[in-house]
């Protein structure tokens, strides 16, 4: 039990540091080296609208992979993202994206309900879904993250994407 508390504490501190860094550095992303460009993709958001890699243009993006029935790190990841969302709410140059790794369970309706339950009331935070093979491909080949054994084996990293669609940092 103590190990679990330490993991949660570490995650909270990490996300706090990450939030501070985003606030101070998001607009000056030229200091952070480009890791790679986000490849082309087209998924569907919680409102049934298409969302593609082109939606990363002109906005700094924080992206993560979650699933709504997760009882492990996802609720904490979502809570931390919610805090960032609250800090940047209404800032047109910043957006948040959560991609489900369990699209069979996380239907469009379920993602919409999740967004409403955590207080998302605009298009600044997108919850995306596609078929599992496409999610795995994007996760593994596009974001260079572990994509086997989904949904339970998903990465807990958040990804910083600059306003031209380049991956800049993993947290």
Q: For the regions a protein language model found, what residue spans apply to each?
A:
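N-terminal targeting signals for export/organelle localization
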Residues: 1-40
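Short loop/turn microsegments at loop-to-beta-strand junctions
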Residues: 38-39, 61, 155-157
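Short active-site neighborhood of thiol/selenol oxidoreductases, capturing the structured segment around
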Residues: 51-81, 97
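Short helix-capping segments at alpha-helix termini
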Residues: 87-93, 119-121
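Thiol-based oxidoreductase modules, predominantly thioredoxin-like and allied folds used
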Residues: 93-106, 123-135
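A short, hydrophobic beta-strand/beta-hairpin element that forms part of a small beta-sheet core
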Residues: 111, 154-171
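Short, internal strand/loop/helix patches
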Residues: 112-156
